[in-house]
């Protein structure tokens, strides 16, 4: 019985498998319109329009709104600021850590 099924399948391709597989790109049936012809007619009027120069003199901006009042004009001594903060105890925190897996082994 299996010999008959093999004979029938030798010359027949599965229609669902036609679009599948490597090496076959899907066919694109869309018609491409040439944008060069259409845009050349419209762009003629656009090319004649001159751009107006920007007149941005920064007169409207108040620098008090831009620069914070706490740091404006101050000289910061970073060495002194570091001493005032004190020592970081980050190294000590690592020594106190106990892994939960170690507790389970006991």
From Swiss-Prot:
The keyword Isomerase does not apply. It is found in: Nucleus. Residues 17-27 have a biased composition (Basic and acidic residues). InterPro entries: Histone_chaperone_domain_CHZ (IPR019098). Residues 1-106 are annotated as: Disordered. GO terms for cellular component: nucleus. SMART domains: CHZ (SM01082). Residues 1-11 have a biased composition (Polar residues). Coiled coil: none annotated. It comes from the Eukaryota. Transmembrane segments: none annotated. Residues 29-62, 85-106 have a biased composition (Acidic residues). Belongs to the CHZ1 family. Forms a chaperone-bound H2A.Z-H2B complex that acts as a source for SWR1 complex-dependent H2A to H2A.Z histone replacement in chromatin. Forms a heterotrimer with H2A.Z-H2B, stabilizing the association of the histone dimer. Also, with a lower affinity, forms a heterotrimer with H2A-H2B. This is Histone H2A.Z-specific chaperone CHZ1.
């Amino acid at each position: 019985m299996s010999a008959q099924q093999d004979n029938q399948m030798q010359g027949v391709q599965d229609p669902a498998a036609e679009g599948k597989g490597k090496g076959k790109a899907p066919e694109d049936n869309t018609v491409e319109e040439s944008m060069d012809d259409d845009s050349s007619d419209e762009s003629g009027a656009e090319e004649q329009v001159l751009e107006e120069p920007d007149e941005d003199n920064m007169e409207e901006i108040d620098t008090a709104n831009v620069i914070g009042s706490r740091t404006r004009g101050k000289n910061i001594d970073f060495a002194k600021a570091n001493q005032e903060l004190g020592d970081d105890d980050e190294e000590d925190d690592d020594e106190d850590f106990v892994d939960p897996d170690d507790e389970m082994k006991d």
